[in-house]
Amino acid sequence: MTNFTTYLSTAPVVALIWFTFTAGLLIEINRFFPDPLVFSF
């Protein structure tokens, strides 16, 4: 039972770190290679 409670306490932490990394990666990709939604000629 302690292994299950340890899993419940660490899975949200791992998910938070993963989602933060993914969001930061997408933000940096869009900063250097912006989407062609707005064409500023």
From Swiss-Prot:
Q: Where in the cell is it found?
A: Plastid, Chloroplast thylakoid membrane
Q: Which organism is it from?
A: Pleurastrum terricola
Domain of life of the native organism:
Eukaryota
Q: Which residues cross the membrane?
A: 7-27
Function of the molecule: May help in the organization of the PsaE and PsaF subunits.
Which GO terms of the cellular component aspect does the record hold? chloroplast thylakoid membrane; photosystem I
Family (UniProt): Belongs to the PsaJ family.
Membrane topology reported for the UniProt record:
Single-pass membrane protein
Return the protein name: Photosystem I reaction center subunit IX
Query: Record keywords: Chloroplast included?
Result: yes
GO terms, biological process: photosynthesis
Task: Please tell me where this protein is predominantly located.
Answer: plastid
Identify the keywords attached in UniProt to this record, alphabetized. Answer: Chloroplast, Membrane, Photosynthesis, Photosystem I, Plastid, Thylakoid, Transmembrane, Transmembrane helix
User: Gene for this protein?
Assistant: psaJ
